[in-house]
Structure formats: structure tokens, C-alpha cells
């Protein structure tokens, strides 16, 4: 069940669903707007000949932190990792779904490539997979509304929520745009 604005506020007031910093003006009829942080991960195209999800490639991306008032320009065809300004903590019976903003989609900005689902039990900043599919550069401003989080109530609490020992959670507690840890999904034969 998708939570309404009243349900979202009730969960926040009860302390079960946490957003930091919380701004009540970001609550929409059935979602919460999320804002862009000032940190980005850019790909180092000259360090690797290709991306291999099975290998740890520590220098594949570099962290860029903007100075106050400075924008990030995402060029046509460009892809960069960003993150939400807000830190989210979901209880064991709520999950999230990150969606783009219609106004930005109409400009050619995609907020996430594939990973829009947030498991119950997650705590951290949400990493954004930002792509420019327009034919002109797009200016990204820290603090701007970049997407919206829909919150869904599970039929029962998760038995093994995100962050539990058996869940294999790789991104619990992440701060800023976190690079892929896909290599952890591959079994090492040593």
C-alpha cells in the first residue's frame, strides 16, 4: 500500500520513518521530494579499458565535492553518481521507491538507471544514477529537488531487513554517492 501525505507525516511524527533534514514542504500527496547533495562520483574513463562488475576497480570513479553555490554540469550522454541531501531510515515494514521529477524528465534528466528500490531497514543517503539523455548540458544545483520517494507499507515486517546479518547489505549507512560493490556478488575461487 502506497502511503499518503497523512500517512507519511504520521510515520515521521511517530519516529518510525526518519528523514534528516526534514522539511514538511517536501511532502507531496503520495511521496516526499528529495534534494540533491553537493557530492558526485565521476567516472575516470582513462584508468580502465572497460568496466568489469566482477572486479573491484577502486579508481573507476572519483569523488567531486562542490563548493557552496557551485553547480555541476552534466553533459549530453553523461552519467554521474549523485546522492540525496537527506538521510533516510526505514523501519522493517516500510520500503521506498525512488522516482524522477516530471519537470526534470521533460528536460532529459534521468534520476536513476535501475536502482530505484529501497529495502525496509535501509539507513543512509540514497545514491542517484543521473543520466543526461538531452542534447544540451544540464546544470545540477545542490539543494534542488531531484526526485521523489514513494513509501510502501509491507503486508508484514521483513524477517531479514536491509542491514541484518543475513541480508548481505552492501550499502547500509552510506554517505554520499557510493560506488558499485557488485564485485561482492561474485564467488571467489581461491
Curated annotation (Swiss-Prot):
EC number(s) given by UniProt: 3.5.4.30
Q: Which residues form the active site?
A: 129 (proton donor/acceptor)
> Which leading EC class covers this enzyme?
hydrolase
Pfam annotation, one family: DCD
Instruction: Provide this UniProt record's keywords sorted from A to Z.
Output: Hydrolase, Nucleotide metabolism, Nucleotide-binding
* Pathway the protein contributes to: Pyrimidine metabolism; dUMP biosynthesis; dUMP from dCTP: step 1/1
Instruction: Give residue numbers for the site Important for bifunctional activity.
Output: 116-117
Listed InterPro entries: dCTP_deaminase (IPR011962), dUTPase-like_sf (IPR036157), dUTPase_trimeric (IPR033704)
Q: Which SUPFAM superfamilies does the annotation name?
A: dUTPase-like
Entry GO MF terms: dCTP deaminase (dUMP-forming) activity; dCTP deaminase activity; nucleotide binding
- Does the keyword Nucleotide-binding feature in the UniProt annotation? yes
Checking Gene3D superfamilies in the record gives: 2.70.40.10
Q: How does it assemble?
A: Homotrimer.
**What's the family?**
Belongs to the dCTP deaminase family.
Polar residues bias spans: 166-190
| Binding positions (dCTP) | 101-106, 119, 127-129, 148, 162, 174
The reactions it catalyses are:
dCTP + 2 H2O = dUMP + NH4(+) + diphosphate
Single GO biological process annotation from the record: dUMP biosynthetic process
Purpose: Bifunctional enzyme that catalyzes both the deamination of dCTP to dUTP and the hydrolysis of dUTP to dUMP without releasing the toxic dUTP intermediate.
Q: Which domain of life is it from?
A: Bacteria
Please report the organism this UniProt entry assigns to the protein: Mycobacterium leprae (strain TN)
Q: Give me the ranges of the annotated region Disordered.
A: 162-190
Its recorded name reads: dCTP deaminase, dUMP-forming
